[in-house]
Amino acid sequence: MKSHRLANRYLAFLGIISGVLIAAGSAQTQQLQGKALVRALQRGGYLIVMRHASSPQTPPTKENADRQNINLERQLDESGRTAAAAFGNALRRLKIPVGQVLSSPTYRALETARFAQLPTPMTVPELGDNGRSMQNTNESQSAWLQKQITKFPRGSNTILITHQPNIAAAFPQWSANLSDGEALIFGSDGKGGATLVARVKIDEWPKLPD
């Protein structure tokens, strides 16, 4: 009898473990893709946290700098400008409403918004690079970004343009191998917090279906 009870307990334990694994698997597959992602974004209510588009690590010389780049900051390269423009065109083609745009004050982040033809961005120090070209970030920036993604807009989407170290510090569990221009898209978790619903590379936006 004792061995029978132990066997039943073992089977019950396996059942619990299986349930946990299934739940974990379901959580991993709840990210939106393709048409489902487009439809969700068309309804609005999401935060799109993106890394600025491609930019060389070395700032330009005075001779090579854009006319507006008076402080000789890092600026987008041709690939970055093209990708940012295609990203913006995709948002308009897909009729994805964009309300507020928050941006790092850096030239390369503002360029990303400009080439994408997004609404005029509001510059936010917490999204910036602290003037150190992102050698490190600080806890207050991470806390600000973590709080910001719980402010869900109604009927539109908010875009935040920042830097890889800021995103990695705030969301280490979701930001591994984040590429230039890639976005993390956050929605409500139904409990007052935010959850990741998609990761979209900047060159994937033009491929999304109408």
Model-predicted regions and their roles:
Residues G131, A168-A169:
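Short, solvent-exposed loop/turn segments at secondary-structure junctions
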Residues G45-L47, R154-T162:
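Generic beta-sheet signal
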Residues Q30-P125, N130-S133, E139-S140, W174-L184, ...:
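Active-site-proximal alpha-helix that buttresses catalytic centers in soluble enzyme cores
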Residues K2-L14:
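Bacterial N-terminal signal peptides that target proteins for export
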Residues S142-K151:
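A short, acidic, amphipathic alpha-helical segment used as a generic capping/interface helix at domain edges
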Residues K151-G155, D189-G192:
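A short, structured loop/turn motif at beta-sheet edges
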Residues M50-S55, L160-I167:
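Histidine-centered catalytic micro-motifs
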Residues I22-A24:
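N-terminal signal peptide c-region/cleavage motif recognized by signal peptidases
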